[in-house]
Amino acid sequence: MKVVMLGADRSVKGGVSAVVNNLYEAGLDQRIDLTYIGTMVDGSTAAKLLKGVQALLKFVTVLPKADIVHLNMAADASCYRKLIFMQIALWFHKKVVIHEHGGDFQGFYYKRCSAKRQAYIKKMLNLSLIHI
């Protein structure tokens, strides 16, 4: 099985990176054909934009051979970034697993998203194979 996993770059200090690094330390990449793509780095806006573009280019390159796309998603900008990747994965008819991180997703969804954005996020989450 070929899995493409996306999330914050493994060098970022944060929860998503810690989980991903733990998966690598546990040998997940030895058990499945895993490609990890970091979609965000710490640093300037320019560095973040460059990382996002690089991630997008790599994603469309490896996506055709993938069986599953695993998105590590948190609130705010992380959610919007991952939904872009999810939409592309769905265009390629790929199965998508969403792993939601962080305790503030409900606050983001209910307090910081308009009704229109909530509807879009809900629609996308419902299109995933599984949402954990």
Segments from the language model and where they lie:
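A short, charged, and often flexible helix/loop element on the N-terminal side
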Residues: T35-P64, L71-K82
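An anion/phosphate-binding loop that grips the pyrophosphate of nucleotide cofactors and donors
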Residues: A66, S128
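Active-site proximal beta-strand in glycosyltransferases
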Residues: I68-H70, M86-F105
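Charged helix-capping and loop-helix junction motifs
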Residues: K82-Q87, C113-Q118
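Conserved small/polar residues in nucleotide/adenosyl-binding loops
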Residues: I130-I132
